[in-house]
Every structure is written in C-alpha cells, then in structure tokens.
Amino acid sequence: MFEKKNLWIPFILCFALSIIGCKSKSGMAKKGSIEQIVPIKIDTIIQKVIVHDTVPKLSLGEHKVWTLGKAGIHANIRQETAIHYDVRKPNYVIIHHTAQNSLDQTIRTFQVEHTKVSSHYVISRNGVIVQMLNDYVRGWHAGLSKWGTITDMNSISIGIELDNNGKEAFPDAQIEALMVVLDTLKANYGIPAANFIGHADIAPARKNDPSVFFPWKLADRGFGIWYNPAELVTAPETFNPIDALRIIGYDTRNLKAAIIAFKRKFVVNDVSPELTIYDKSILYNLYQNY
C-alpha cells in the first residue's frame, strides 16, 4: 500500500508544477498587458490634467466670440436658457405668436429636447421680456422658410415670440415691450427697417403668425414696411404683381400662399388668395419703395 502511494507522488508533483507554470505564464501575460496599457492611461490622465489645469490665452477668434457673447446678453431682463442653437450674426428680426396658453408653457417648450425649436425672446401679455438665447446665437425658430434669395433664415435672424394664442389682440403692454426690444436690436446691430418681418412672410404655406391682430403699422416707428394710404393709386396695366411680391421678398412658388400672407399683413379684412384692384394698389405702393 505504501509503495502504491509513492508511485503517485511523481504524478502529483508534475501536476502541481504544471499548475504553477500556468499561473506564472498567466501572471506574465497580465504583467505584459499592464505594461502596455498603463502608459496609455497615464498619458490620457496627463492630457486631461493639462487641459483642466492650464488656462491658455484666447486667440483673436475666441476673444471675439467671448466679447460678442457678453454683448449679446441684456442683464436688466429676465434670463432663461433654450437648448437648441448655433452661432451667427443677426440681420433680420422674425416676429411670431406662440399659439400657446402661457409664457411658462412657451419657455418649457424651448427647454425640452424633443421639440427642436427655440427663440431668442419671449414677451408675455403683460410685457415681461424673457431672453432665452444670446443675440449672436442661431436659434431654431424660422424652420423651412425663404425670403428673397435667403433660404436659411435662422442663420441671420433673431426670433421673438409673443405670448398669444393667435385669436386675440396683442395687449398694449406687450407691444410696448416689443418696441423696446426692437429698438435695442435695431440700434445694436444696424438692422434695416425692412428686415423686421413676420413668420408668415417667410413661410407663407406653413405659418400664419403673427396673426391679423398684430399691428404691423408699427412701421411708423421704424420696424417693417407699410404703404402710404395717401399715395395709393391704381396699379398700371404693365404692373406685374407676382414680380412685385417676389421683389419684396415673398416666395411665390406657392402663389396663393404668398398672396394670403401678403393680404393677412397689409389688407387684414380680406385674406382670399386673389388680388383685388385695391390689393394691387397697396402692393404697387410698396413695390415702388424697393
């Protein structure tokens, strides 16, 4: 019995040595892996430390963006933050109505991921002005639109939303607050009077805002265009109303939509898709100023 046990000893020793050898090889493999991976991790950590702990001097371009960023925020009014935007210089102002029930609902709409829409300013019915995007930031308010030859209105415009459901008049307090914003934007960025327009102007087939209740005669104060009632005359037979609409800026590919948008703004009490003699006289008067 003793001799049989001794016969097993060499096999047991060999088995034990093979296990130790395997562990050693495994340990060496792990050690080799660590030697290859650790330097990469260290480099990554060092790079992160350099990025976070070093404050480099701003380049001219970065300094300009930083300066514009400061200039585009108006500290004396309430600030909220929208989440959908890009950066650009404004040269147009697009006026909208919210078609929602409250200021807070509109703000919330501009702060949730799935809506993919935003505006620079929202003005409440009682005249509270809320800035949601820096003036130099590209908002997402115009959507699919066209004005003249411009097909990306978001890139050159500031969007202003008026808290209004589209079926009611715009309160005086709201319009006066709007005037303050428009006057500031015009002074700060040199925006031409003709470049204050409505959402329906640039997207006539999709939008009707601001509604017919909006007082576009604010052109008297330098924002937008308006005709001179004292100078209305019958348009000559050679007058081409389609060309006139196009020259003003309307997208005439959908002519009926363009006519309705024009009449909703300048005629108001008749928004049919046909131009009457009176409508043409208004259009002709506007056309002469372009």
Regions found by a protein language model. Name each.
Residues 2-9:
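Bacterial N-terminal signal peptides that target proteins for export
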Residues 11-17:
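Hydrophobic helical h-region of N-terminal Sec-dependent signal peptides
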Residues 19-21:
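C-terminal motif of bacterial Sec signal peptides marking the signal peptidase cleavage site
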Residues 31-191:
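Active-site-adjacent loop/helix surface patches within enzyme catalytic domains
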Residues 24-36, 171-290:
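Basic/polar, cationic surfaces and motifs that engage anionic cell-wall
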